[in-house]
């Protein structure tokens, strides 16, 4: 798949992960340790986007999806190339103007649309403290 992407073919893949950052880690960790640096280099050059999805219990029954969207950027490429995937979550949190949506931001929005219980959303949050601060700031009227 990486070789196909290098030739400018559009490649889609699916992984069972809870966040975009975890998906990037899973992609590189799937290779032998002696190949991971090269994989990170290639991935940093070809990755255009990652979409993560979770299903949560909806108030009143059923399920509702929550999404995280990571878009390719120079900062993302550097993080992947240097193996600093722990910074990807913060890139997403600050990349809203570039079309990125953080899982925790999306979860907080579902809470405020009264679609899911705050405890259900908190359980699925990537960064529990960040999610908690979003909920508190929204309740205090500091953010919309």
Where do the model's predicted regions map?
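Short, flexible helix-loop junctions that flank or precede catalytic/ligand sites
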Residues: 1-144
